Amino acid sequence: MMTTSVLRMIRSGGGWQLLDDGRPVFWFPERNKGLEIARLMADARSLNHGTRTMLEVQNDDDAMETIAAFA
């Protein structure tokens, strides 16, 4: 069975918090910069370790939305 990792961007403190499997790892003042780093992390994790990684972002309705998957 393949392990799946989840990176999540949530609103926090006037910016965006990046969570790695529920653990806070970075805070960004801008959503786009956070997404840029999160995509890079997810892609690297998939390429280097073969770990399936999902990237989820909190939308305007406060629901989590999957915006990318790296396998």
Where are these regions (language model features)?
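Short aromatic-glycine-(Arg/Gly/Cys) micro-motifs in beta-strand/loop hairpins
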Residues: 1-24
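Charged, amphipathic alpha-helical segments
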Residues: 3, 30-43
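Generic marker of residues within folded, mature protein domains
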Residues: 8, 45-47
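A short, exposed loop/beta-hairpin motif centered on an aromatic-Gly-Thr core
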Residues: 21-33
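Short, mixed-charge low-complexity intrinsically disordered segments
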Residues: 47-71
